[in-house]
């Protein structure tokens, strides 16, 4: 499964002819309003609220629901999607690929493994 987090990342991956099975966007780029990436093949649209700097229970539940929905799935976040990379790495099946943008750096690609899940869980534990 390929999962993108972020409007620019999603837009760039789609422009390469790759359709992420799950796309998480918020209509923002570097905290500025932008048009959402175009994708006329979306089968399922889910929404959630997630304020900047937080990971809400609603977003976690929406991410979990996405993995049992018909792909391609787009999650539209009211707020900010940046930190949702973390619960995505926990919920994604092993061998999934999670892509997100690191501002002013480039694209980050995470191959989900048990080791990645353990590292992410430690980060989430510290955040709680």
Regions found by a protein language model. Give the residues of each.
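Charged phosphate-binding loop/patch that engages nucleotide di/tri-phosphates or the phosphate backbone
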Residues: 112-128
